[in-house]
Amino acid sequence: YLFCWLCLACWSKPVSAEGQALLVIPEPGEKTLIHSDWYARKANEVKMDGNRLSAVPLDKTGWLPARVPGTVLTTLLENGLYPAPEFGLNNNLIPDIHEVGNDFYTYWFTRQFTIDALPEGRNVWLNFRGINYKAEIFLNGKRINRNTHEGMFLRKTFNITPYLRTDAPNVLAVLVYPPTHVGNPN
C-alpha cells in the first residue's frame, strides 16, 4: 500500500514543455495528493538501485500504470495480470506470497514531475500517509530516508526541498517490500 502527498505543492493539469506533470508551488500550508502518473514494476526486473533509477527520467517501457493509493495487487489486477478475485474461485489464481516468496511482491513505484521555480525560503515536504510494509525512498538520485521505513501504514514526512530540480524532471522512486514474515495460509 502506498499513499503519499506533497505539502506546499499543488497539482495542476498544465504540462511542461517536456510533457512532464507540472507541480505548481502554492501558498504556504497548502497541500496536494500526488495520486496520478505513478508506474510500478517488479523490483527484480529493474536492474539498477534507487539512486540510479531516480537519477534519470524514467523509460516507461515494461512499467505498469499504478494506483496510488493502492497495493501491488491492485496494480496487477487493474492491468489485467490476474482476474478479479471476488468472482468464483479467481482468488486461487493469484499467487500466494507464502508460496512464491517476498520478492514476487516487492515492487518499485515511480513518478516524474517538474516544477517551474521554488520561491526563496519555502520548503516542500513529502508526506507518506501509509506504506505497507517497508520502503526505501529516492528522489533525483538521492535516498531521502536514511533508515528503511518499516511498519504497517506508518506515516512519515520528509523535507525534499534540497533534492528538487527546477532545470530537469524530478524522479521519485519508492521500493515497497511486503512484510518479512508472511505467515502460513493453511
What is the predicted role of each segment?
Residues 12, 89-91, 139:
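Generic cytosolic/nucleocytoplasmic N-terminal low-complexity/intrinsically disordered segments
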